[in-house]
Amino acid sequence: MRKLLLTAFAVFTLFFADAQLKTPAPSPTQSIKQDFGLSAIELSYSRPGVKGRMIFGDLVPFGKVWRTGANNATTITFGDAVTIGGVKVAAGKYGLLTIPDKKSWVIIITKQTDVTSPADYKAHQDLVRVEAKTMDMEDKIETFTIQFSNIKPSSCELHIMWDKTAVSLPISADVETKVMAQIDQLMNKDNRPYFGAAMYYMDNGKDLNQALAWFDKAVEMQSNAFWIHHQRANCLAKL
């Protein structure tokens, strides 16, 4: 009995000692918050390295659901509704899964936020499935990377890259409808956003005469604001 207690104590001591030792994570976690449209998209995933291994078709098998990272499930959170693959996805937190293959991947947005292995995956929880052609890269990406690119007012792309393979997922948002609704609402109030509304009309190819009228109102309110005069001149040049 005494020997058993001593053994248990030794094991506990070693475990406690190891628990105090902090070392770098083999696949560190990254969280990204990207402003997009009128809100933001947040992404959380872990980043394994190539480390001399063969990645796709070996470490990551072809034709099987992949958590798209390491450790925990990869999640994506939309602050506002977006459209992916022609499907409207409501604001909220979702899982980001993929099924890699040699020439194309299936990218999945799922209600499941805890998938870490193919056995956990439930296809009926899918919201979106998009086929994305693979792109061969000249330079190797040692650390698994997901990033946003080509960010525009109402569209962006989510790039998934590792080793010498990349895929891209287009994302869009109906920004115009919401901005126009805001303008209509705020123009019926006392403190009207003449300059902001005029800029939106001018920058997005809308009614320039209306934009000019709003610039004129903005000048009346802030006659010494040189930037308003400058943008008003830009509007006149486009008429």
Protein language model regions, located:
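Canonical positions in the second alpha-helix
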Residues: K217-A218
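Long, contiguous interaction/recruitment modules in multidomain scaffold/adaptor proteins
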Residues: T74-M187
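Structural motif corresponding to the intra-repeat A-B loop/turn of tetratricopeptide repeats
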Residues: N204-G205, L239
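Bacterial Sec-dependent N-terminal signal peptides
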Residues: M1-K22
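Structural register within alpha-helical repeat arrays
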Residues: G196-A198, R232-N234
